[in-house]
């Protein structure tokens, strides 16, 4: 078996990635989320495939086809709710994975980090288009509002929006193409994940100290396969509790009303995992400015290696930047809350304050804190 594992052209790739891979001996449970994201992707592709067998991407029948899946297909309700809540679990793992990367300075592995940012954008695009497919009120109006933001692009904006819509409003053509893209993107994401892993295995994993761990490596199997399996069990437990006991808790009641272009819902808002970005978008009165802030709220991650001023990689031994980091986490929670609130006093001013704080902490306060720590520890 050992000979096949190490010699066979295909199996040796798996061997070098998941079995004989040298891994740092001290990586904590924060390093579990990569494998959990892989599991989430697999769940989403499988449940999505079975949903696609019964779904029709036509404005006249889309809403009914989802109802049909839930009522008439064997375990269709389970597949549908696993897919909907699987997206939420996916984003929880994504945010924790990115948060881990920021905390421990993993962004210094630039190729892996940039690939991760591309993956984040791809997953967000996929989730957005998936939300449109049930063709409920929030699906329709969410699609209208978000695609309409592109009209803020000077000169080509309006033409671009109509081109994406396939007409003069969100309609049959839009739904069909969104279904096509929603179906193909997860497979593109899977390919990008392999590239992400390829880049990661060029440098090896980071670890909680942020120090070089070449002198102390252990094989991935059995140590981290077992450790990852515990994470899998915890995730599946949480996932099943969410899906079987509270399937609609993260959804919007408006999406149980069929799409009606003549009736606008009182509060148009995206799924919970986009609310922080939506709050940043709404906090700027100018349309183009809002769109740029929205994109920059994610794209700012790409500038993290440039904003790293400390002589140490991780935040493990850096209490000042640690404080900044947790304030940033709290700020993101505030933004998420504000994104779901109506546009009125006092929510407008809270959202604007939180948006300014978000960019200030990342671009100004954390780099300054890094320099202060260098001076305190006399690392200059």
Curated annotation (Swiss-Prot):
Listed GO CC annotations: mitochondrial inner membrane; respiratory chain complex III
Cofactor: heme b
A Gene Ontology biological process term: mitochondrial electron transport, ubiquinol to cytochrome c
GO molecular function, one term: metal ion binding
Keyword field contains Transmembrane: yes
Alphabetized InterPro entries for the sequence: Cyt_b/b6_C (IPR005798), Cyt_b/b6_C_sf (IPR036150), Cyt_b/b6_N (IPR005797), Cytb/b6-like_sf (IPR027387), Cytochrome_b (IPR030689), Cytochrome_b_C_euk/bac (IPR048260), Cytochrome_b_N_euk/bac (IPR048259), Di-haem_cyt_TM (IPR016174)
Cofactor descriptive note: Binds 2 heme b groups non-covalently.
Residues where heme b b562 binds: 83, 182
Position of the signal peptide: none
Note: Heme 1 (or BL or b562) is low-potential and absorbs at about 562 nm, and heme 2 (or BH or b566) is high-potential and absorbs at about 566 nm.
UniProt family annotation: Belongs to the cytochrome b family.
PANTHER family according to UniProt: CYTOCHROME B
Biological role stated in the UniProt entry: Component of the ubiquinol-cytochrome c reductase complex (complex III or cytochrome b-c1 complex) that is part of the mitochondrial respiratory chain. The b-c1 complex mediates electron transfer from ubiquinol to cytochrome c. Contributes to the generation of a proton gradient across the mitochondrial membrane that is then used for ATP synthesis.
Name assigned to this protein: Cytochrome b
Encoding gene, per UniProt annotation: MT-CYB
């Amino acid at each position: 078996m050992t000979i096949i594992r190490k010699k066979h052209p295909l199996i040796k790739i798996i061997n070098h990635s998941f079995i004989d891979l040298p891994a740092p001996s001290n990586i904590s449970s924060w390093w579990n989320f990569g494998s959990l994201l892989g599991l989430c992707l697999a769940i989403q592709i499988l449940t999505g495939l079975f949903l696609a067998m019964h779904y029709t991407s036509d404005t006249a029948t889309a809403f009914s086809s989802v109802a049909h899946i839930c009522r008439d297909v064997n375990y269709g309700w389970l597949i549908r709710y696993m897919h909907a809540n699987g997206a939420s679990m996916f984003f929880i793992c994504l945010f924790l994975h990115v948060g881990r990367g920021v905390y421990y300075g993993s962004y210094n592995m630039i190729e892996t980090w940039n690939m991760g940012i591309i993956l984040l954008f791809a997953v967000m695009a996929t989730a957005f288009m998936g939300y449109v497919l049930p063709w409920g009120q929030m699906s329709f109006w969410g699609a209208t509002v978000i695609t309409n933001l592109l009209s803020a692009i000077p000169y080509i904006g309006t033409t671009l929006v109509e081109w994406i819509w396939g007409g003069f409003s969100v309609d049959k053509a839009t739904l069909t193409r969104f279904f096509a893209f929603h179906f193909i993107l997860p497979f593109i994401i899977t390919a990008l994940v392999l590239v992400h892993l390829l880049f990661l295995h060029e440098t090896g994993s980071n670890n909680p100290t942020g120090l070089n761990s070449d002198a102390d490596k252990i094989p991935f199997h059995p140590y981290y396969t077992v450790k990852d399996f515990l994470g899998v069990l915890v995730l599946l437990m949480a996932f099943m509790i969410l899906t079987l006991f509270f399937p609609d808790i993260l959804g919007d009641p408006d999406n149980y009303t069929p799409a009606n272009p003549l009736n606008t819902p009182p509060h148009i808002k995206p799924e919970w995992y986009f609310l922080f970005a939506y709050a940043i978008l709404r906090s700027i009165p100018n349309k183009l400015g809002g769109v740029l802030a929205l994109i920059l709220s994610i794209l700012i991650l790409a500038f993290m290696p440039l904003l790293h001023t400390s002589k140490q990689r991780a935040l493990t031994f850096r209490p000042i930047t640690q404080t900044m980091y947790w304030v940033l986490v709290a700020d993101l929670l505030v933004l998420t809350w504000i994104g779901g609130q109506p546009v009125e006093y006092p929510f407008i001013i809270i959202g604007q304050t939180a948006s300014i704080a978000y960019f200030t902490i990342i671009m100004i306060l954390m780099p300054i804190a890094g320099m202060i720590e260098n001076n305190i520890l006399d690392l200059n």
